[in-house]
Every structure is written in C-alpha cells, then in structure tokens.
Design a protein with these regions (language model features):
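Metabolite-binding pocket within alpha/beta catalytic cores that recognizes anionic/polar moieties
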Residues: 2-141
Length: 141
C-alpha cells in the first residue's frame, strides 16, 4: 500500500499541534465532536446548558473562523452523561474558496485529539414558510 503524497509529514505535524491545542484549551480528552449548521447553537444550549469550556475556532491552528450567516466561531465543551462532547458552533465551507485543507482542519484536529466519533449537522432550509436558515429554532417548528 502506498501513501498518498498529499499527506506530507508537515500536514500530520499541523494536526498534532491543533489536536494538542484542542486538548489543552478544553481541559481533557473529548469523546465526540458535533459540528453545527446554521442557527443550531441556541437549541443546543437549551438542551445541555452552559459549556464547561470554550475556545475560538480561529485560535486552533489551521482552523479558519466561520463567516457564513448563522455560523458561530466557537468550539465548546459540554459534559454529558456519556462523556465530553465538543461542539463547533460553525464551520468553514468549500464554497468560500479557501480549499479543502481549511475546510477539513477541525475534523483532522479532532482525530489528533483522540476523537473517533463525529456528527456533522446541516440546517439547509425548512418546509415551513417564514422560517429562514438563520432564524431556525426548535421552538418554531
């Protein structure tokens, strides 16, 4: 089996640094990563309460702060009955023109931090008229 030449040692080193930053910023080894779509962060806070730690996504090496409407710029740690869950309140999209590396940086940092489970959400519209992507809330459905 050959190694894909795009996966250079520098790329792997970047992920190790980013993973270490995630672990030191959020005080411990997380069990899972959830990446939220537009407007979903408030619903999560209603369900799980305040996070135990927060770091700006842009402070993690290689991760670009989200700019899309409805996307937040935080990585939050929540204590749940099943362990620590990291929640990104937004993400960078490929259509923003930055290329695949910044788009996948958070996922690669999560793997380097020891996370083996992830959920990627999307709030791409609604069948109910009058609900925009950025105004979605669980109480309006």
């Amino acid at each position: 089996m050959s190694v894909d030449p795009r996966f250079t040692q520098a790329l792997l080193d970047d992920e190790a640094v980013a993973g270490a930053r995630v672990l030191t910023s959020l005080a411990g080894r997380p069990d899972a990563l959830v990446v939220l779509g537009s407007g979903l962060a408030e619903a999560l806070d209603e369900a799980w309460g305040a996070p135990v730690a927060t770091v700006a996504l842009g402070d993690i090496p290689g991760v670009v702060a989200p700019v899309a409407d409805g996307h937040g710029g935080e990585l939050r740690a929540y204590e749940t009955r099943r362990g620590v869950v990291l929640v990104a309140t937004g993400r960078t999209h490929l259509y923003e023109g930055l290329g695949p590396r910044p788009v996948t940086a958070l996922a690669r940092a999560a793997v380097a931090a020891g996370i083996s489970r992830a959920v990627l959400t999307n709030a791409n519209g609604c069948l109910k008229t009058g609900i925009s992507v950025t105004s979605w809330r669980s109480s309006t459905m």
